Every structure is written in C-alpha cells, then in structure tokens.
Amino acid sequence: MGQKVNPIGLRLGINRTWDSRWFANTGEYGKLLHEDIKIRKYLEKELKQAAISKVVIERPHKKCRVTIHAARPGLIIGKKGADIEKLRKKLMEMTKSETHLNIVEVRKPEIDATLVAQSIAQQLERRIAFRRAMKRAVQSAMRLGAEGIRINCSGRLGGAEIARMEWYREGRVPLHTLRADVDYGTAEANTAYGICGVKVWVFKGEILEHDPMASERRATEGDAAHGGGGDRERGRRRENA
C-alpha cells in the first residue's frame, strides 16, 4: 500500500497536516474548495520564478489567510513591498473578503520534494541530460541532511521513441513507516518530444511524537534531521507509451 499511495495523504493527522485549514457549511464547502484551487493556480502561474513549495490557506471568520512557502521570497515581496501589496489586493478580489498574506522562506530548497521536482523539470526543458539532473539533485539533498531520496522520471526521456520510466535512489525511503517524515512532490516538463513527469520522495528522518504540525514546524525552523548515506541504487523499467 505504501508504495502506491500518496505519502503525504497517508500521514495526514499523524505527522502531517492539511494545506487548506478551514471548516464550512455544506452549502459553502464547494465554493470555498474551488476558490482554494483558483488561488493556488493563480499563484503558481504568477510566481513561477519564486520557487513556490506550497500554499497554505486558512479561513478565520469572514477572513482569508494565505501563507506562501517559497525559496525566493524577495521576488514575491518586491521593492519596498510593492509587489506583495498588489498580490494581496488581487487575492482580495478573488476571495471577496479581507485577505492577509504571509511569506515563509524555504531555507533548504534542496531537500524540499516539490522544489527538487520543479528544478529537475526545468532542467529537462532546457535539454539537460535527465541522468545528470537526477544525480545532481540526489547529491545536493544528501549533502544538506536528507536521510534518503528517490527520484522518478518518466516519458520520452532523451527524445526516445518509446516512453519509459527511470529512477535513482540514495539512502533509505521508508514509505510504509507512518512515523517517517517523507516529503513528496511532482512536476511536469514540457519538452519538444512531449510531457515528462517527475516524482520526488525525500526522507528527512523520523518524527516520534504524534503531532500533525510536527513536519511543518520542523521545516519552518530548519531542523531537518541529518542522516548518513546508505547504499546507492539505480533502476530502470520500460513502460509502454
């Protein structure tokens, strides 16, 4: 089961928490859910260069609080905070309510699964060899304290006629262990030969306390567990296009 399910969804309520944190009546739930999706799509499109890891949306009474976790917060804030104020006004138009905007810096983007996946996808679009991009990402993650990392790249890799999936792993990535702090992220690369998918799993150590906010608190404080290497594995599997 752990091999197939989304590692974040499997650990919700154990050591991970939701990115949308609010309650709503039955009649309003669908409207607010679509509003969240619209906000996230808009931010990902407008702030593509800011390397956004995730967007957390909270809704106190008749208000909306949006927290953007990004590796380059300066690009969001702008000169003297001009850009962030424009962004806040745009979000107020979308939500039609008082909106507060917070920016949180991702201190170690090399061990953030979403940012690693985005980086590899951008390299594939620039025609950098996928093996080199994967290996470089793995080495950076292990050097900065990850206990294990696995990367999957699938599609017409290197312009091959038959699509396939290749993976690279270093250290350990225990997908079945619920107390394991496993970060997961995906990205798509729009290459000349079609779309290539990138999946990344990063194991940052174990969280022994039963606390849904533990993983986020650890990431915010920059206290990712430091771990050793482990054996290096590479694998390759062909799949039909």
From Swiss-Prot:
Entry keywords, A to Z: Ribonucleoprotein, Ribosomal protein, RNA-binding, rRNA-binding
One Gene Ontology cellular component annotation held by this UniProt entry: cytosolic small ribosomal subunit
One Pfam family per UniProt: KH_2
Cross-referenced CDD domains: KH-II_30S_S3 (cd02412)
Keyword field contains rRNA-binding: yes
Region annotated Disordered, chain positions: 214-241
GO molecular function: mRNA binding; rRNA binding; structural constituent of ribosome
An annotated GO BP: translation
Tree of life domain: Bacteria
PROSITE patterns, sorted: KH_TYPE_2, RIBOSOMAL_S3
Domain KH type-2: 39-107
Cytoplasm keyword on record: no
Function noted in UniProt: Binds the lower part of the 30S subunit head. Binds mRNA in the 70S ribosome, positioning it for translation.
Family that this chain belongs to: Belongs to the universal ribosomal protein uS3 family.
Oligomeric form and interacting partners: Part of the 30S ribosomal subunit. Forms a tight complex with proteins S10 and S14.
The protein, known as: Small ribosomal subunit protein uS3
Biological source species: Mesorhizobium japonicum (strain LMG 29417 / CECT 9101 / MAFF 303099)
